[in-house]
Amino acid sequence: MKKTILLAWVGIGALCAACTSSNNTSVVKDGAGNELFVAHYQEIKDTVVINLSDLVEDYELIRFEDNDSALLGFRVMPTITEHYIGVSQRRGQPYLLFDRQGNFLCNVGNVGQGPGEYAWQIYDAAISEQKGEVYLAQFAFSPKIFAYNLQGKLTREIETGCTLSKPKIEMDDEGNLCVVQIPMPSQKSLNLAIQMDGSGNVTRTLKAEERFWMDDFNGDLFAYHNVPEFSFHITCCDTLFHYDRTENRVVPKYTLDFGMMDEKPGHIYNEIPGYYMTTVFGKGIILTDKQKCTSYYVKFINDLYGGISHPVTFKDGYVFTLREPTHWIHYIEKRLASDDCSDTDRKQLTELLESIDEEGNHLMFIGKLK
């Protein structure tokens, strides 16, 4: 029978111990010293309740500016830095730039066919505060990454040397840009990875093995930028990989073993410091502890805001929830209706509920990961 375990953590470090074997997780080592973690899906039974205060070093609730230019749509995906939040929306809408107080700064470029305009939805973005630039990569069909200043004006077009398909981009501390994309023979683009220097010159490419090839756009590439390594998951290859920039190679790091299941559930891999993570559609989130070599389902509780429970995303070294006001009202009212809501939590949540404008723009809980 599945059981739920409540851990009172001092912090993430409290779970770090010598690696021990478990019945639900294996580690496969190759001759080069790499470790591949394999979590055995059908053996994962327990659920651990984790307070968000154990994961973050600071947190805030951001109320995005409420005007027609700044309104956010459904299922938006932010790019987060210390001082900025960029938001990619559905096709036909420009990329929006905000400061960390939620103030709308500008549209970054615009939708269209002209110079510096993008015809397709922005699939990924990077923001360099050091260089004062925002980098936008379109969904597909373009061999360029557009660079804009923090006022939203085009500064340069970075040629990647091939047409990109669902690219993910990262910039290191030295200003070097790295792209990982889905290789598609139909698009005559077989590079899996492309490295560029700070001036935008291509310095290295990595041709994709056939296992990474896709014939159409029915799959996806996921990269959440939470760890120093370029950690990514292409859905046609059921493994989370690291792209090693120095060695110019990909290294398998994590996968779920579904055994003899006739139909595997849909799932997405992610990685945060100390853990691999799998979102299993219709089932929940699995964490695999790299130190303890064990896996379990996890339920996150926002003890920083009255113990409410809400979906969370881990990206760019942060944990966040970005939702419309009606969603937040639902989360709060559900918690207020629970029997175990303390007087302290009830007071905090009631004040928060009264401060929310149901017709306003999105609210974002955000915490920086330890």
PLM feature spans:
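Asp-box/WD-like beta-propeller blade repeats and closely related beta-sheet repeat scaffolds
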Residues: 119-122, 139-189, 206-209
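Beta-strand-rich domains and repeat architectures in extracellular enzymes and scaffolds
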Residues: 42, 47, 59-93
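C-terminal motif of bacterial Sec signal peptides marking the signal peptidase cleavage site
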Residues: 16-18
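Short beta-strand elements that form the blades of beta-propeller/WD-repeat-like
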Residues: 36-37, 83-90, 132-138, 175-186, ...
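Repeated scaffold domains used in trafficking and secretory/extracellular systems
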Residues: 73-77, 119-125, 163-171, 213-222, ...
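Conserved blade-ending motifs and adjacent loop-strand segments that build the rim/top face
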Residues: 251-271, 292-317, 329
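Blade-loop segments of beta-propeller domains
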Residues: 65-75, 103-131, 138
